[in-house]
């Protein structure tokens, strides 16, 4: 494995930042493919954070363009935002990255365990006095349980006694850390335990003073919190009738009451895949689906590699349905891991349309986006623009969100096509099952519309919770009454964003931007494939630069 050729093109200030990045976020650098960072973890002491901030400020002074300044400011903002769930969460990700990339290498894992132990001590000292909300305490317990879970996984696999000793020492430290934030009654950390507590307490999370800055500077939203809530509320009101309409049509076909929850249950009965077969279904279907998406939606780099795995037990609290992680973007062999959750306590995809929805979102949205960008397949992102910074999240989730809409439109075209390829015919057969074409289209539209509504709710949730407008229980009750979606699903699909304040609006906010730009490109004679391939290869610059580059592409290629 060799370094990504882009590293040889770094400017002086990019090289300075890269050295800072390896020092301050070595676990992410290792995930990106920097082998020298194996076994390393940043110790977030007050002194280390101050030194890191001072160094980055000096690098910021050397920035030569807006893109560099925006990214460095994003990292500066994140340095100042520290909450107790962060170190356990980052530590779990670090251990997981080591297992995925190299398996159990005792020296690296012993070093990592020691560093994480020091980091937990440092964080306990850094955040000792603040009275944290019960929600923050629960999330901290959950992320610490994830860390304990992955440690147990390694302990069960390794025969190295010195590694076992190091991991057991870290386990005791993590248990001690967890007790600092312990909430009585939380063991599994699922809906059945947590939601009754939220109904009783109805606390508000104190983020009102920091939230606007996180949106603007860390995540790079041009929109204010008020604009995000207004947009998402408008979309919810606009598209909810579409969900209700398709729900009524399916309910009539199924012979059930026309509610989202009942129709979803009936869809699972009719098109359900047994939990133990869900992973294999995804693996088999993706081989056919990839050819269809590449032919009709987006071209894919020849270096594309994605591995599909079942979500490990220690991650299901934060991956209730599906997720994707990218690795080795700074090497010549980037790859992705696609997680499929099957645990019934959460919100796993269990029907054919739901599993296809997860597949197209995670693979032909996220995975293609990261792979095309890392390999500079159809664009020329800079070193800073292929990093998995906070800026990557709005862009890649916006792409994936819009990909779901594109898929339903593609299905409508395929069923009208006179001559299908063997892959297209096989794919439609899988989707149809034993129903007619009209019912199949309605089922996939239903799933797409249901998830669009959920993404609008996520955006509203993020603003209302973090601007202290509602408690989580109040929001869930409002959203359930407003949409007909189950309280469990709403909770599972919003609670996870407490760990990443400001993330949740990205799907719908950026997805709508991409939709409008795509419409403009199509009107000017640019093909859907050409547009999507370019956008998926652009990397992850600040939003305004991302949009500017797309507009320039449209101007260059208009016919």
Feature names for model-found ranges:
Residues 1-559:
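N-terminal maturation segment of proteins
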